[in-house]
Amino acid sequence: MKQIVGLVLILCCTQMVAQEVFPDGKAIPEWFRENKEVNVNALGKKYSITNYGVVNDSTVVQTKKIQEVIDLAAQNGGGVIVVPQGTFLSGSLFFKNNTHLYLEENAVLKGSDDISHFPVKMTRMEGQTLNYFMALVNADGLDGFTISGKGTLNGNGLRYWKSFWLRRSINPDCTNMEEMRPRIIYMSNCKNVQIEGIRIMDSPFWSTHFYKCSFLKLLNLRITSPASPVKAPSTDAVDLDVCNNCLLYTSPSPRD
């Protein structure tokens, strides 16, 4: 009996040890278990975009005004860019050191369906470094950047999808590189990033793309694209490109 109990204890200990390592045998760092929610109150001053001339209007593209709020926060040491309840239309936004994005409940940051509102810059796409349209939310070289809240990043992809399928009907071999369209989130050379709680929907192209990022946490996100009435082409939920130490986790009881 003692031998049986001893064998059970050994097996239990072995199982516990197995749970503490990756499949390649390397130890799992404690970082993967420390999944605390973003505390926006600890991230500095809050800059609600509607306090700086941005209006709740889903028909007016307000890229310039929203970017000015981001730049103002960066110039003053950083802070949290707050998108309040409402729908705000924008092209590419570029976040700076010590700035963060917070989407309140029922807040929607919506991408323009006009590709001209997304500048062409050197970026990464399908394994290549090339000039391509930037995303709705962009971050490069940031340490500690966060996106949090209960709001939505809406890529507003319908017009882009229709254009893709029209081109594909004319040229069945049409590729993504021939029918260019923006992503929702693109981050490069960033570390200690956490994106949590938000909804990401209707991306024109890849929903999120991370290049050369490390210590990246994507927690309790809801990422969706439709299959009908117009199928959303190549709207991958998450694309990890030359990244390391990444955690994608959804709790057993998502919001919806």
Predicted regions and their residues:
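Conserved small/polar residues in nucleotide/adenosyl-binding loops
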Residues: Y249-D256
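Extracellular "leader-to-stem" segments immediately downstream of a signal peptide or signal-anchor
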Residues: K2-G6, M16-V82, T87-H100, E104-N189, ...
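Glycine-rich phosphate/ribose-binding loops and adjacent secondary-structure elements
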Residues: D241
